[in-house]
Amino acid sequence: MNIELKKATADEIPLIQQLSESIWRQHYIDIISKQQIEYMLAKMYSTEKLQQEINSDLHTYFIAYLKDKPLGYIAISKESDNKIMLNKFYLLQEQRFHGLGKKIFELVFSNYPQSDIQLFVNRQNFKSVNFYFKMGFKIADVIDNHFGEGYYMNDFFIVKKTH
């Protein structure tokens, strides 16, 4: 299984949006309300927001491909010389539970071998939480962040130490 992570440019914004809409609407429907899904998609994945993130290097987006077929994407920001934030890690529903997430993580670990990896994951997102635990992440904190319009992100802040 040869997965490739290709750095995304502004040209891939429509693909990131398409993947996001499919993934979020399928995966989060049992975790948060449909209204919150739509609100968060509009806020986080507008063309303007993605252009700002990609063009300013706030986040580095990578699209995961298997045989030239997009499977999902990740977004990483470097917090310090020895810390990265995995801001986004999403796979299409039909691509889950085939070992692809683990392969993508292996690529991330190999690209950032001396960096602790940290991320936020919704506390009710049990499948993802369990996946991260299997990958060696530990809960560092429990966070409730107001996202706007009365919506909250009820997350675990988790970390995988590499050193």
Where are these regions (language model features)?
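Extreme N-terminal starter segment of soluble prokaryotic enzymes
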Residues: 2-4
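Active-site acidic-Proline motif in GNAT/NAT acetyltransferases
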Residues: 92-94, 98, 123-124
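C-terminal "cap" of GNAT-fold acetyltransferases
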Residues: 118-129, 133-135, 142-163
